[in-house]
Curated annotation (Swiss-Prot):
A biological process from GO: positive regulation of translational elongation
Family statement: Belongs to the eIF-5A family.
GO molecular function list: ribosome binding; RNA binding; translation elongation factor activity; translation initiation factor activity
Protein name: Translation initiation factor 5A
Protein's job: Functions by promoting the formation of the first peptide bond.
Gene from which this protein is expressed: eIF5A
Length: 131
């Protein structure tokens, strides 16, 4: 699993974080000081990259959290197999199967021969956009 660590206070909306073992994109973040002697807390709302589930995290601002390492790659669609696509990496020429994305506009563009940008996040692959 490819991950690194960051301080929770350094992150902002749009960054990625691992909550409960799932990579998520931060959509909302607020910081508040709890009281006279308490340390500041951060309230993070994030959406899972693969599941789309909403996850929340409340933790001290200075806590170290896991951040996924996202590898951005380019591939070409070889075959459409229903809910799966067969994709060939343009650098290593390795072939693999990946699920079709849920976005309808993107699904319409995914035909054999089309180049796509895909991400490898914690060993899983997902198609992001066409090139």
């Amino acid at each position: 699993m490819s991950k690194t660590y960051a301080t929770l206070g350094e992150l902002k909306p749009g960054n990625f974080i691992i909550i409960d073992g799932e990579p998520c994109r931060i959509v909302e973040m607020s910081k508040a000081k709890t009281g006279k002697h308490g340390s500041a807390k951060a309230h993070v709302v994030a959406i899972g990259l693969f599941t789309g589930n909403k996850k929340t995290l409340v933790a001290p601002v200075d806590q170290r959290v896991e951040v996924p390492v996202i590898e951005k790659r380019v591939g070409q669609i070889i075959a459409d197999m229903g809910d799966l696509l067969q994709v060939m990496d343009m650098e290593t020429f390795e072939t693999f199967e990946v699920e079709k994305p849920s976005d309808e506009k993107l699904r319409e563009k995914l035909k054999p021969g089309v180049e796509v940008e895909y991400w490898v996040v914690m060993g899983k692959r997902m198609i992001i956009r066409t090139r």
